[in-house]
Amino acid sequence: MSRAAAKFKIPMPVTKADFAFPSLRAFSIVVALDKQHGIGDGESIPWRVPEDMAFFKDQTTLLRNKKPPTDKKRNAVVMGRKTWESVPVKFRPLKGRLNVVLSSKATVEELLAPLPEEKRAAAAQDIVVVNGGLAAAVRLLARPPYCSSIETAYCVGGAQVYADAMLSPCVEKLQEVYLTRIHTTAPACTRFFPFPPENAATAWDLASSQGRRKSAVDGLEFEICKYVPRNHEERQYLELIDRIMKTGIAKEDRTGVGTLSLFGAQMRFSLRDNRLPLLTTKRVFWRGVCEELLWFLRGETNAQLLADKDIHIWDGNGSREFLDSRGLTENTEMDLGPVYGFQWRHFGAEYRGLEANYDGEGVDQIKFIVETIKANPNDRRLLFTAWNPCALHKMALPPCHLLAQFYVNTEKSELSCMLYQRSCDMGLGVPFNIASYALLTILIAKATGLRPGELVHTLGDAHVYRSHIDALKAQLERVPHAFPTLVFKEERQFLEDYELMDMEVIDYVPHPPIKMEMAV
C-alpha cells in the first residue's frame, strides 16, 4: 500500500470493477478421431484404445503441476447432454472434475437420477447444468468462483460442442487442442470433427507429439498430439531476436559482456478482454513484474522493499559496490536514487533519500494523465517520462523504459499505450517490460473507466547479450502458446493501493524457465 496521504493518491471510479473479468473463459479441447475425422456415432466410441482413455483421464483431471486436484483447485469438463449420457453411469460425474453439462431442459436432479440415491448428494457438488451452448458455459467459468477455482476448462464433446468451439466467439478463447489420431477408419462414425478446419481464420501449430504408437489391446496405431493457435504477437518478439542474432551489429557495452544489436523496432500487443501479454516460450516472473510496477506507481526508490518480498531484480544495482561505482557514496545500500517511480510521481523534486516524504512535491505525471483522460480524452499530451537529465547522475541506473504516451479510442472507449524504450535487453528485460506496461495500461484504464486496448512497444537499441545467445537459441525452438488472462479478485479505493493478491493470472501455460544471468 502506498505511504502517500490520501489527497495525493489517485481515486478509483465507481466503474473500477466493470472489466475485472473476461467475457469468456479460455478453454482447451480433448478429442480422439479417426482418419476421416470421425469421433463416434453419438452414443459410443467405435474403437478401443485404453491408452487414449488413460490420457483423457490424466489430462482432464491432473493440474498443470501434474498433481491431483484439491478442494480449492480443479479442472472443468464441458460436454453436451448426449456426451454426458454416453459416460457409463458408474463413472458419472467424471471424478475430480467439475462436470459442466449443456442442456436446455435437464436439471441436475434429472441428470443424476440414474445414480444410486446414496451417491447423488455428493455427485451434485461436481456438476453444473448450463442452459445454453459452449459460449454460455465458458462465460460462466470466466466469473467467480470458477475463474479462481477452475485451473483449466476442457471441452470434451460432442460434435456440436466441438463445432461451436471452432466458431466465434469461442474460437478466440481456444488455447489448446489435445488430439488423438486413431490410424483407422471406423465405418460406424456418424459424427465428425475436421481439424484443423479448412480456410480457418486461425492458424494452428503442432506444439508436441508423443509419436505413433500401437495400442496394447486391439493393436490400433494412434498418436497423441497437442496443437495451439499461432501466437503472432509472441512471434514478433522471437523473430526480432532471430533477426538481431543473424544481422545485429557486434558492440561493446558498459557491462563488458558485449552485445549484438540493431536500432529501431516495434511490437504490438492486444490487451483487450483482459488479455495479458506474458510471454510463454519461457516462464515470466509475474510476481516480480507486478510488485515492481506497483512499486513504481507508489513512487518508491528503496530496492529493499522488493527484496523483502523475495524479488531481487534490483539487488545488483542497489549494492554498495555498484552505488559507489556510480559515485553515489552517500546513498544507503539499496537506495537507488530518483529512479522510475520518483520521476513518475515527483518529477523535478529534489531527491533527499529513500526515507523522505515527497507528498505534493514535483510534478505527478501519472495523476495528471488520469485527470486529463477524464477531462479531455482527445488530448495529445497524455505522456510521462522517467528521463530527467538533471537527475540522471543521482540515479543508480538511468531509465531504460523512459517514455510512455496514452491514446484514447473514443469510439470504443479503449485506452492504448505506446512505450519507448532506449535500451532493450531482449533476453531478460523486454519480456518483463512488455508485461509491466501492459499492467500499467490496464490499471490506468481502470482508473479512467476505459477498456484496455493495445500496447505498442517501440525499441531503440534492441540488443542480445553475448552471454544470452545459447539460451535464446533454445527459446527460439519453442512453440508459443496463447497468452493468459488477468482477473481482479479485489478492488481498491486508490490506484496506488492495489496489491499483488488483488489480481490473478489465469490460463497461463508457459514453457519452463530459461536461465539467463543479468549483465550489471
UniProtKB/Swiss-Prot annotation:
This enzyme's EC code(s): 1.5.1.3, 2.1.1.45
Pfam families named among the record's database cross-references: DHFR_1 (PF00186), Thymidylat_synt (PF00303)
Residues the entry annotates as binding substrate: V30, D52, Y162, T180
Segments of this protein annotated with the region Thymidylate synthase: 234-520
Keyword Disulfide bond: no
Keyword GTP-binding: no
Annotated NADP(+) binding sites: 32, 38-44, 81-83, 102-105, 157-164
Catalysed reactions, as listed in the record: (6S)-5,6,7,8-tetrahydrofolate + NADP(+) = 7,8-dihydrofolate + NADPH + H(+); dUMP + (6R)-5,10-methylene-5,6,7,8-tetrahydrofolate = 7,8-dihydrofolate + dTMP
Keywords annotated in UniProt: Methyltransferase, Multifunctional enzyme, NADP, Nucleotide biosynthesis, One-carbon metabolism, Oxidoreductase, Transferase
A cellular component annotation (GO) from this entry: cytosol
Domain DHFR: 26-229
A molecular function GO annotation: thymidylate synthase activity
Positions with a binding annotation for dUMP: R254, H401, Q421, R422, S423, C424, D425, N433, H463, V464, Y465
NCBIfam families assigned to the protein according to its UniProt record, in alphabetical order: PRK01827.1-3 (NF002497), thym_sym (TIGR03284)
Matches recorded under PANTHER family: THYMIDYLATE SYNTHASE (PTHR11548:SF2), THYMIDYLATE SYNTHASE 1 (PTHR11548)
Family designation: In the N-terminal section; belongs to the dihydrofolate reductase family. In the C-terminal section; belongs to the thymidylate synthase family.
Its job: Bifunctional enzyme. Involved in de novo dTMP biosynthesis. Key enzyme in folate metabolism. Catalyzes an essential reaction for de novo glycine and purine synthesis, DNA precursor synthesis, and for the conversion of dUMP to dTMP.
Name this protein carries in UniProt: Bifunctional dihydrofolate reductase-thymidylate synthase
Organism: Leishmania amazonensis
Taxonomic classification: Eukaryota, Discoba, Euglenozoa, Kinetoplastea, Metakinetoplastina
